[in-house]
Amino acid sequence: MRIEKRQVEGQPLTVIVEYPEWNNSVQSLIGKIEKMDLSFVGRSEDRSVSIGISDIYYIENVERKLFLYTKDEVFRLDGTMPDIESRIFDTGLVRISRTCIMNTDKLREIKQIRNSHLEAVLDNDEKLIVSRKYLPEIKKVFRKEGV
């Protein structure tokens, strides 16, 4: 595989994938590239903002309301956890508890804190509780990424 990188000012990010034959690896690569463009619309007071996957730290369900957390802002989301889960497949966002979805790209470390719980520490020093029930999903993401 050959990778070429080139900065072109004033142009949107463009990715061209050239391949000798269509196969699962090519399909997976294109799927991941397309997922990078996925975004959610979050509301904060009187404004609505489009938030890309790469800006999301975690999504939390609090008293039947969804909140999306970025590095330093919180937005209200419409929908339900199952709605969100159906959109985030293969993006690095994974369910870590009944009420929380975390972006594994923002994960700094996981450590055990109690018998059945783990603590995820994110790049912004936010700490989230990880249920052991969801640990296999997190491990699966790390295996895919070669971590």
Segments (PLM) and residue ranges:
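Amphipathic, soluble alpha/beta structural segments
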Residues: 2-10, 121-130
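Short, charged, intrinsically disordered terminal tails
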Residues: 140-147
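Short, charged, solvent-exposed linker or helix-capping segments at domain edges/interfaces
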Residues: 26-29, 132, 141
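N-terminal regulatory/sensing modules of transcriptional regulators
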Residues: 1-27
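Conserved binding/recognition cores within well-folded domains
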Residues: 25-123, 127, 147
